[in-house]
Swiss-Prot record:
GO terms for biological process: L-histidine biosynthetic process. Keywords: Amino-acid biosynthesis, Aminotransferase, Histidine biosynthesis, Pyridoxal phosphate, Transferase. One of its GO terms (molecular function) is histidinol-phosphate transaminase activity. Pathway: Amino-acid biosynthesis; L-histidine biosynthesis; L-histidine from 5-phospho-alpha-D-ribose 1-diphosphate: step 7/9. The lineage of its organism: Bacteria, Bacillati, Bacillota, Clostridia, Moorellales. It holds the Pfam family Aminotran_1_2. It catalyses: L-histidinol phosphate + 2-oxoglutarate = 3-(imidazol-4-yl)-2-oxopropyl phosphate + L-glutamate. This is Histidinol-phosphate aminotransferase. Belongs to the class-II pyridoxal-phosphate-dependent aminotransferase family. Histidinol-phosphate aminotransferase subfamily.
Length: 386
């Protein structure tokens, strides 16, 4: 017969009315204790569930309001019977299409499960505990997140007039600096760094520091002085990598496809940490088809330009200041607590992004939508601000 011994802890539990013991779990790495999980824009379905609002528009995550290219949708459908197969781990056909479009070689390309994965690869490849990255403030938060996961830290350089202060960023580089991020156009401000400014900045960056040019929104830029960053790679510049995505103008955010362009040596090192089969089969075929549909890209630019002009005029009529944008979103000062206005907009079926997460409590970041979406947003905003 087995007799279970009564331990002191068991007796204490019995004395307290059989309370559940507190679970002891394995200790996580110190580096991640200070990390705050990324909070994405609310999905439409979540707002419908929580608030019971039937008609909801999302202007929070800078997606293409026209959706994906019809050619991409057709490619998905035609490839659907092959999803039992592993995808091409090398993304050969997508690299082939990108190389032809960009004027680079396939060995200059790395494909990721969104550019977020490439940011993770960069941190895993270059960041040791105690290393630093240099970023603008405000900018895309995933740069800091990727560095923190590896035990690094972000040196944040405040923007000037909502633009990168490149001189201050160059001055912030130390022997501990491994990566410098230039989000161009910048998220959330929509401002850009021009060709001359970027050329001058790169001359100040040591060869040992990799400059990451995040051009997720470059397809929307109309400014003539926007940099031709691919020329750096074609010329063999060894400390630059360009990141671009299929999540914005190509309308494939739900499939997660992004890519990096750099000299082969950088690509080789990033491939050391890349997961096998990291880009799924459907994402690859859709991206190839989307890349070839220039008419859809052109229409998307047209809708964005018209929407930008409309929102500018409406903000001005409301007496609201905004940051002129080169992207598909606008950073606007609503002169009230953005969190409260955000909640009121949700009740009216409009999802936007609050500025407090970027350090601007009275700002909203609003994706430029279709004419109907823009009018719905402005109508709701007018009612709230009245």
């Amino acid at each position: 017969m087995m007799v279970r011994k009564s331990t002191a802890s068991n007796r204490r539990l019995q004395d307290k009315g059989d309370e559940e013991p507190v679970a002891t779990v394995p200790k996580c790495r110190e580096a991640i204790l200070s990390i705050k999980p990324y909070v994405p824009g609310k999905p439409i379905e979540e707002v419908q569930r929580e608030l019971g609002v039937k008609d909801v528009i999302k202007l929070a995550s800078n997606e293409n309001p026209l959706g994906p290219s019809p050619d991409a949708v057709q490619a998905l459908q035609e490839a659907s019977d092959r999803i039992f197969l592993y995808p091409d781990g090398n993304c050969y056909y997508l690299k082939e299409a990108l190389a032809a479009k960009l004027g680079v070689k396939q060995e200059n390309l790395i494909i990721g499960n969104g550019t977020d994965e490439i940011l993770k690869m960069l941190a895993e490849t270059y960041i040791n505990p105690g290393d630093e990255i240099v970023v603008a403030d405000p900018t895309f938060s995933e740069y800091e997140f990727a560095a923190q996961v590896m035990g690094g830290r972000a040196i944040k350089v405040p923007t000037r007039n909502f633009r990168h202060d490149l001189a201050a960023m160059a001055a912030a580089i130390t022997p501990r600096t491994r990566l410098v991020f230039v989000c161009n156009p910048n998220n959330p401000t929509g401002t850009i760094v021009g060709q001359a400014a970027l050329d001058g900045f790169l001359k100040q960056v040591p060869p040992s520091v990799l400059v990451v040019l995040d051009e997720a929104y470059s397809d929307y830029v109309t400014a003539e002085h926007y940099p031709n960053s691919l020329a750096y790679v074609r010329a063999g510049r060894a400390n630059v990598i360009i990141l671009r995505t299929f999540s914005k103008i190509y309308g494939l955010a739900g499939l997660r496809v992004g890519y990096g362009v750099a000299v082969p040596e950088i690509i080789r090192d990033l491939n050391r940490v890349r997961e096998p089969f990291n880009v799924n089969l459907l994402a690859q075929v859709a991206a190839v088809a989307a890349l070839k549909d220039e008419a859809h890209v052109g229409k998307s630019r047209e809708v964005n330009s018209e929407g930008k002009d409309y929102l500018y005029s409406q903000f001005e009529s409301l007496g609201l200041k905004y940051v002129p944008t080169e992207a598909n979103f606008i950073f606007v000062d609503i002169q009230r607590d953005s969190r409260e206005v955000f909640r009121q907009l949700l009740q009216k079926g409009v999802i936007v992004r609050t500025g407090d997460i970027f350090g601007y409590d009275t700002f909203l970041r609003v994706t430029i939508g279709t004419r109907r979406q823009n009018e719905t947003f402005i109508r709701a905003l007018r009612e709230i601000l009245a």
